[in-house]
Amino acid sequence: MFDQLTEIICEYVETEREKILPESRFMEDLGFTSFDFMSMLGEIEDQLDVEIDEAEAANIRTVQEAVEYLEKLEGEKEE
């Protein structure tokens, strides 16, 4: 999931994949704007066929938090 997410992140901000760490913060470290972040969430929904709750997504600050949230959604999808 981390690799898949870093691939998507690189489509939205100019950064090298190697510089994206689990503890990287979307806004502060990776330079995301709110619009970039919401656009990326839409792409994640399409690629992973999941539905992201915007209220829950607002609490996601780091790449690792996003990975954990997406893994949770993937698990729920399989149930």
Predicted regions and their residues:
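Thiotemplate assembly-line natural product biosynthesis machinery
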Residues: 1-17, 76-79
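C-terminal structural segments of small proteins and small subunits
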Residues: 49-79
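Two-component histidine kinase catalytic core, primarily the HATPase_c
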Residues: 36
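Phosphate-binding glycine-rich loops and adjacent basic patches that engage nucleotide phosphates
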Residues: 1-7, 26-33
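An amphipathic alpha-helix signature
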Residues: 2-6, 10, 41, 63-67, ...
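Phosphopantetheine carrier-protein modules
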Residues: 12-31, 48-59
